[in-house]
Amino acid sequence: MPDTDLLSLQLEHVGVLQNRYEQVLEDHGYDGLLISSGAAPMCYGDDQSWHFQGYGPFLHWTGLAGFEHAWLLIRKGKKPLLSLHQPVDFWHASLELPQEPWLEKFELRFSESPSAPELEGMSQLAVVGDPALLAGLPGDENPGALCNALDETRVHKTAYEIACLAQANKLAMAGHQAARDAFLAGASEFEINLAYQRATQQREVDAPYNSIIGVNEHAGILHYQYYDTAAPVKSRSLLIDAGVRFRGYCSDITRTTTGVEEGRFSALVHGLEQLQFRLCKMVAPGVDYLDIHRKTHFGIAALLSAAGIVDGLSDEELVSEGLTRAFFPHGIGHFLGVQVHDVAGKPVAPPADAPFLRLTRTLEPGMVVTIEPGLYFIPSLLEPLLSGPLGHHINRPLLDELQGCGGIRIEDNVVVTDTGCRNLTREAEA
């Protein structure tokens, strides 16, 4: 059982959610809200199902990531009703409900049927979840304004949520260290993944997302999804982007490790890490997240010039001409919570110069964000530069040398505090 402090924080968390949800129901004219946990759909033409990922609002309340066909009914002035599906089944094991104090805050029911519980005494009901599971239920299905308001309840994390995220970081960092050790010992991508799973005691299907484990040029594929079973003749670099789910909450951490005799690339990794430290320290109340993203591009420009990858252009010119976007094509980060890319990050669309930015808000206490600058050598992005009017400013021989290392990304999970920030990842790494 978790420590008593965490369990006490969870009791407070449930109380906070009850107040937040009752206010949302009041604001939108509903008596109650029925939340589906979801269920894994079946593969077409097969008797196997896809991997199950629980629905965010259900996880927000319960943290029960593996419970399919469960239902949560929120009612004003009453205990939430938690209905769990427990069929009589000799093919599969049933998940056990943890015997923890937070359950006292709920009315519990168990059902052999996957159907929703009977709904009585509510004239205005909303139901949210996968539409395929809501068919035939009374009430308004996934009303847009209400769903947006529910997303907003997840923007500012409770103390319990931050504690869960901190533990998810601690568990993940043990995996990252094991992955680094395996890489330096000459392991393949597949073996590195096994080392990560062993250290985190987590199956692939239980992870918050598929671990990205790229060796050498594979580190330049942003969401590289395969694992080579044979190690390369020379292991020059490792990029691992991997997390852990703890009580429903996700960590999302990236580290880049260099092999021996990679002096130029190692210097770039060190330079990007120093930039990442500075960017993390920018996280504070009142800071526009877009400003952190744009600051990153100027930092990337300085690294490119210092490394001799480009010359003859100022940092301002490298940014304004779009050269840095070829080396750093994604956003600086996103919200983090019960989903890796947590909700409500883009109340306004990202600007044209940052189309992939997942967070466009001014930071406030209680928000949790990732800070993940990258510097990559991606042929499809660099070839247009090399053949364009600014190509003569780029050191092609050096670029050719570095492309075999793929790229660099360094990512931490950072809490916005009342006065600045708290870096959960560096705490776990210490």
Give the label of every model feature segment.
Residues 1-430:
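Active-site neighborhoods and metal-handling regions in enzymes and metal-associated proteins
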